[in-house]
Amino acid sequence: MMPLLLLAAASTDLDALDQAVARCDRHAANPVFAGEAARRSQFLLDAYREQEAIVADRLALADQRRAVREAGPVKASDQKQFDLQAAALEDRQKALNDKRMLEGIRQDAMDTMRRYFLTNCPAGKAIGK
């Protein structure tokens, strides 16, 4: 449920920013644009850490499989456990890929709104005009 709440919050934030940009509301838009670089950096760090953890877990799983194969015939229970671990890793990778895709779309939207704002809302223009 938590990822759905985060998606809804991000969508709401973009909607609010879009409305502020349409009104040339500098008081609402400028803080969002100013915080964007830090937000992007944090997202990249978080995505890197998660990808690094997935890779480490994949390597550990491969080492476990190799050790079991070298010890002799693989038991069905061991194979099932390996399959479950591999499926969990695949789910984590898909979730990370989805987050990266959504973040890319969000960044494109932010960049487009910022360009529109800079082009159509000259400094000193009254709010809503």
Spell out what each predicted region is.
Residues 37, 47, 86, 120-121:
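Prokaryotic Sec-type signal peptides and long signal-anchor helices
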Residues 1-10:
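Sec-dependent N-terminal signal peptides
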Residues 6, 43-44, 50, 78, ...:
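Generic alpha-helical structural signal
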Residues 18, 29-30, 40-42, 51-52, ...:
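Low-complexity, intrinsically disordered short peptide segments enriched in small/polar/basic residues
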Residues 53-102:
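Mid-chain, structured segments of secreted extracytoplasmic proteins
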Residues 10-59:
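Immediate post-signal-peptide N-terminus of mature secreted/exported proteins
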Residues 21-32, 88-129:
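C-terminal amphipathic alpha-helix
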